[in-house]
Amino acid sequence: NTFSDENPGFPCDCTSADAKRACGIQCACWPRGDTPGGGRRIIDGQQ
């Protein structure tokens, strides 16, 4: 599976710039307590 506009909530890795770029738009890290280094894409400012 890949990061794409068709998978807006697809998990992304917040540990590197390359990984963030792979998310397509922007990667937001999960709040503390969730998977370390994990995140999700944000589209149009919406989570």
Swiss-Prot record:
<protein>
    <recommendedName>
        <fullName>Variabilin</fullName>
    </recommendedName>
</protein>
<keyword id="KW-1015">Disulfide bond</keyword>
<feature type="short sequence motif" description="Cell attachment site">
    <location>
        <begin position="32"/>
        <end position="34"/>
    </location>
</feature>
<keyword id="KW-1217">Cell adhesion impairing toxin</keyword>
<keyword id="KW-0964">Secreted</keyword>
<keyword id="KW-0800">Toxin</keyword>
<dbReference type="GO" id="GO:0005576">
    <property type="term" value="C:extracellular region"/>
</dbReference>
<keyword id="KW-1199">Hemostasis impairing toxin</keyword>
<keyword id="KW-1201">Platelet aggregation inhibiting toxin</keyword>
<dbReference type="GO" id="GO:0090729">
    <property type="term" value="F:toxin activity"/>
</dbReference>
<comment type="function">
    <text>Potently inhibits platelet aggregation induced by ADP (IC(50)=157 nM, complete inhibition at 514 nM). Also inhibits platelet aggregation induced by collagen and by the thrombin receptor peptide SFLLRNP. Is a potent antagonist of the fibrinogen receptor glycoprotein IIb-IIIa (ITGA2B/ITGB3) and the vitronectin receptor alpha-v/beta-3 (ITGAV/ITGB3).</text>
</comment>
